[in-house]
Amino acid sequence: MAQKKRKERRYVPYGVAHIHSTFNNTIITITDPNGAVLAWASGGFFFKGTRKGTPYAAQLASESVAKKVQQTYGMKEIDVFVKGPGPGRETAIRALQAVGLDVKSIKDVTPIPHNGCRPPKARRV
């Protein structure tokens, strides 16, 4: 049987963290500068149901992704792009800093319509 060629570890010292935060969940994706995904996690990795959308779930997801890219790719610096209005936005950024990644910039890329689609009707509770 042929020997498997061992995959060499790629060194990526700088990356981009994309934090997509909705009211129901928070998804953190870390990519290299070209946009190739290195690691990702979401609140649903750790909790199910309504607890996915909590800041604590976002913190756990952010910490796990940051540790993975530090150990696997030797990443030290990141830029952060935040999208969405959810409760996990700030917590996810703080968790990235707490793990030891150097956050160079934070940019809000939440899509804002210039009077596009009609919004859904208001809930009557």
UniProtKB/Swiss-Prot annotation:
GO (cellular component) term, any one: ribonucleoprotein complex
Molecular function terms, GO-annotated: rRNA binding; structural constituent of ribosome
GO BP terms in the entry: translation
InterPro entries in alphabetical order: Ribosomal_uS11 (IPR001971), Ribosomal_uS11_bac-type (IPR019981), Ribosomal_uS11_CS (IPR018102), Ribosomal_uS11_sf (IPR036967)
UniProt entry keywords in alphabetical sequence: Ribonucleoprotein, Ribosomal protein, RNA-binding, rRNA-binding
Superkingdom in the source lineage: Bacteria
Pfam families reported for this sequence: Ribosomal_S11
Record-stated family: Belongs to the universal ribosomal protein uS11 family.
Function: Located on the platform of the 30S subunit, it bridges several disparate RNA helices of the 16S rRNA. Forms part of the Shine-Dalgarno cleft in the 70S ribosome.
Subunit structure and binding partners: Part of the 30S ribosomal subunit. Interacts with proteins S7 and S18. Binds to IF-3.
Name listed for the protein in its UniProt record: Small ribosomal subunit protein uS11
Gene name of the record: rpsK
